[in-house]
Regions:
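Active-site capping/gating regions of soluble enzymes
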Residues: 2-4, 15-16, 246-253, 266, ...
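Catalytic alpha/beta active-site cores
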Residues: 2-280, 284, 302-305, 310-314, ...
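Intrinsic disorder at enzyme termini
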Residues: 2-26, 41-47, 51-83, 347, ...
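Short, conserved glycine- and acidic-residue-centered signature motifs
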Residues: 243, 365, 533
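Active-site-adjacent loop and "lid" segments of alpha/beta metabolic enzymes
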Residues: 325-337, 523, 527, 531, ...
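A general structural motif
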Residues: 329-332, 550-556
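C-terminal accessory/binding modules appended to enzymatic or scaffolding proteins
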Residues: 498-544
Length: 644
């Protein structure tokens, strides 16, 4: 072999040596800067995520050299790459724990057994069916806990757990040691999500301490302490906030349980965490890895880092980004969300049915949701790979940055007196509200898009029919509230736009099926009007407006007369910035003379305020553009035409 080819930097063709990595990156950056033609690199190619972290267009080894966890393996502290060394053929890497709606415990059991035969391998037990021993026994009839562990978040109070589960186990002829899974109480998240508790936190902690101590002696395979931070995401918060809140709640439980004579060594293995899965694939994947890192750090502070591996993580697809409109797109959303969770190393996953925000999920939607989780494991074989994302420079760097962001937020909560004190003072609510406000603004300007709702809506879609599936009864609510706070209220990204479409549908129903209309006054050749005509049609379609006006016009007067004659209450002039100074005065004056009540809109926003003012004086009522508040503007226009 030649000496040239022996060199690790030699060109395979025998030419010049391959430049080192630093030189290649420098050349790449110089080439990119040249192509950007003066546009700042950071503005064009760097994306700021909701967590306040910059996503780079290119990641390289140098970015992760200082990241401390990169040389660890799955099953090794700090367990960022998973609590266990996974990847063996046939090994269950994660449990599939699907929600099963049912009107009674018997119906639930029947549907559950059928689901277990079709690939589900964990029981997600509704709190309503854990209210008494008889109901619980009926719900869990013929369920073998070794093959299908039970996940039962019972709510704020642990008082009845020992009696109800003890009674159910006795009726089955089994000991407590047979029970596997997580039977958890979580008063802190219940208080945050609902704003009230039927008992004091001190009383709730005493119940949780008693249940945890009992389980530690009698039910070694059962988690008892729930920490559900999903309310942060459902309230519009970001991943860093969700992680910080989860850690803050766990530390609050540690303190309170220690005061109730349950030490950290007993409590740490009993934690069962739950998170909502958001829509951003890589940040969500990194979130679950970052959680393990943070949890290991917390448990290490209490004396034994190895105990961190025993906590379990359940992930459920969030409701925040699910839609009533174009609901079949929800299947795509839940698929990528579930994938990010399982690649992030969760212990169990719950995939929401595509119609869950529309109606009680039917048999079809439940089957599709279950099959998504099964396919990730059985067909795509992700269960056979340990930490498949490990080693990705993007994932490793983002994991590290996200963990640091979350830890900083956690420290702020601690300075506020811990989670309970911060919640009582409204600080947790303010934290989430700030992120939610940013998301609302991004949604309203379509910087954050919801496909089928505020982007590319389908006005011809047929709504889903009513479900014949009975809903699961709600768990008993406390008669009185012993503790109250302002709740972190859940909302959905699409709900404001869905409300606009509902107004539009009512308008159509009251007008013989005719939707509210907007006339597009297209000027000149296709290249002159098409970009803004397409933008305008999409803009108004978000609120259910039908765009009319197929032909293009040579003169502004012609366009104005056609708009007035169309019967549409709104007309949009679609052309280019350089033609508007000539077109606007003639169009607006002719239009208002022919039909004084019509709303005149200009597609585009002039760069200077003086031109905007002159166009308004000419008769233009408003402007639509990429920075416009879409939702507010459409709501105002619907109101102007009498739609309610």
């Amino acid at each position: 072999m030649s000496s040239k080819l022996d060199s690790p930097t030699a060109s395979p063709s025998g030419g010049n040596a391959i430049p080192d990595a630093e030189t290649l990156r420098r050349v790449w950056r110089e080439t990119v800067d040249k192509e950007l033609l003066g546009v700042p690199f950071e503005k064009k190619l760097v994306t700021r995520t909701a967590d306040g972290i910059d996503l780079q267009p290119l990641y390289h080894r140098g970015m992760v050299e200082a990241v401390p966890h990169c040389d660890t393996l799955p099953g090794q502290a700090p367990f960022l790459r998973g609590a266990h060394a996974r990847g063996a053929k046939g090994e269950i890497a994660w449990r599939i724990a699907q929600a099963i709606p049912a009107a009674s415990a018997a119906d639930f059991n029947k549907a559950l057994l059928a689901a277990l035969e079709r690939g589900q391998n964990a029981v997600l037990l509704p709190a309503a069916f854990a209210a008494d021993g008889g109901t619980l026994a009926a719900a869990l009839k013929d369920i073998h806990f070794a093959g299908a562990p039970v996940l039962a978040p019972v709510g704020a109070s642990a008082a009845a757990i020992e009696q109800t589960f003890g009674s159910a186990l006795k009726s089955r002829g089994e000991q407590w040691s047979a029970l596997q899974g997580a039977v958890t109480a979580d008063p802190l998240s219940a208080l945050a999500a609902t704003g009230k508790l039927g008992l004091t936190l001190e009383a709730a902690t005493a119940e949780l301490a008693a249940w945890t101590a009992f389980a530690a002696k009698n039910a070694p395979a059962v988690k008892t302490i729930g920490v559900d931070a999903g309310f942060v995401v459902e309230g519009g918060g970001n991943s860093a906030q969700e992680l910080a809140v989860a850690i803050a709640m766990a530390v609050e439980y540690f303190r309170r349980l220690e005061a109730a004579k349950v030490d950290a060594k007993t409590a740490a293995p009993r934690f069962a965490f739950s998170f909502a899965i958001g829509s951003q694939f890589f940040p969500e994947l990194a979130k679950f890895r970052a959680f393990r890192l943070l949890w290991s750090r917390v448990v290490s502070a209490y004396g034994d880092a190895s105990l961190a591996a025993q906590a379990t993580v359940h992930a459920r697809t969030a409701l925040f980004n699910k839609t009533v409109l174009d609901p079949y797109v929800n299947m795509l959303r839940t698929t990528t969300e579930a994938l990010s969770a399982v690649l992030g190393g969760v212990d169990s996953v719950q995939v929401g049915a595509f119609d869950e925000v529309v109606r009680t999920p039917d048999e079809f939607s439940q089957r599709i949701a279950r099959n998504i989780a099964i396919m990730l494991s059985e067909e795509f074989n992700f269960a056979e790979v340990a930490d498949a994302a490990g080693g990705s420079w993007l994932v490793e760097k983002y994991t590290d940055e996200l963990a640091r962001k979350a830890w900083a937020i956690f420290q702020t909560i601690e300075k506020q007196g811990g989670f309970a004190a911060a919640l009582a003072a409204g600080e947790i609510q303010k934290l989430v509200a700030a992120s939610a406000a940013d998301k609302r603004k991004a949604l309203d300007t379509r910087r954050l898009s919801v496909l089928g709702t505020n982007l590319f809506p389908n006005l011809k879609e047929k709504p889903l029919g009513a479900s014949t599936q009975a809903a699961t009864p709600a768990a008993p609510a406390p008669a009185t509230a012993a503790v109250t706070v302002t709740p972190v209220k859940a909302w959905r990204a699409a709900e404001g736009f869905e409300a606009l479409r509902a107004i539009s549908e009512r308008y159509a129903a009251a007008n013989g099926g005719k939707r509210p209309q907007v006339f597009l006054a297209k000027m000149g050749p296709v290249k002159q009007h098409k970009p803004r005509a397409d933008f305008s049609a999409g803009f108004f379609a978000v609120a259910g407006f039908e765009a009319t006006g197929k032909q293009a016009f040579e003169s502004a007067e012609e366009a104005a007369k056609a708009a007035a004659a169309s019967g549409a209450p709104i007309a949009v002039l679609c052309s280019t910035d350089d033609t508007y100074p000539t077109l606007v005065p003639a169009f607006a004056s002719t239009l208002k003379a022919a039909k004084p009540g019509i709303v005149a809109i200009l597609a585009g926003l002039p760069a200077d305020a003086a031109t905007v003012e002159s166009f308004k004086k000419a008769g233009i009522d408003d402007f639509i553009h990429v920075r416009a508040n879409l939702r507010d503007m459409l709501a105002q226009l619907l109101a102007k035409i009498g739609a309610k």
